[in-house]
Amino acid sequence: MSLALNPVAFNLGPFQVKWYGILMATGVLVATLMAINEGKKRHIMPDDFIDFLLWAVPIGFIGARIYYVVFEWGYFSQHPDQIIAIWNGGIAIYGGLIAGLIVLLIFCHQRMLPPFLMLDIIAPGVMAAQVIARWGNFMNQEAHGAKTTLSFLESLHLPHFIIQQMYINGSYYQPTYLYESTLNLIGLILILSLRHRKHLFKRGEIFLSYVIWYSAVRFFVEGMRTDSLYIANTIRVSQALSLILFFGAIILWIYRRKVVKPKWYLAGSGLKYPYNRD
């Protein structure tokens, strides 16, 4: 029996509420709650994470859209009216992450908060949000890999509804969203299980662990996708950026250990909680 999964969850008058949006919102909520909970242990107030979120989410979406438009400029230069039509699709996670990082650095400077500690606290939640939001691609039947066979998908022992959803226009496709979501879930479990061990992570290293893990996963998965953004029609943008981030994070980790010598992550912010900025 065919299981047709509708990307639209429900309608509000003339507006469609899609599962992709619901899953993204759920991911943001989970990330926020995780950051607030961990932040209390590291002596960072919940209000700081909520205030950061109010800036980071909208600017992150703008960054994700700008990133996509820049690398699809051949199309958007001919259809400038579509540049702001984000409701038609077209955002890129790396653009959102870059924009969010810029917001965080400015926010930490204004609030006098340690940026690497904030990154450490926020990174696992971001990873959890990515695990959840990738299922929006599943509901939309997008961001998939190349054509494959029913027998291959069955050999992965996938639930029938996943296999059925990968049947698009008469062919089966690789569920790359599932590969990325699963691998990120493994990375998230590892980070969460290790981050509270004494004398393991110094400040900034949980964030760098996330960068190393995600960039490796994205490089692998991006090579399988059929909707990649390209540079000069030859180089996959996300693979190139993943390589830069992977090696850049390793170099920064070594540099900070040998030269900067940061505090241990478990030492927290050093601020008296709850603190007063007046």
Curated annotation (Swiss-Prot):
The keyword Zinc does not apply. It is an enzyme of class 2 (transferase). It is found in: Cell membrane. Keywords: Cell membrane, Membrane, Transferase, Transmembrane, Transmembrane helix. The keyword Transferase applies. It is a multi-pass membrane protein. One of its GO terms (biological process) is lipoprotein biosynthetic process. Belongs to the Lgt family. This is Phosphatidylglycerol--prolipoprotein diacylglyceryl transferase.
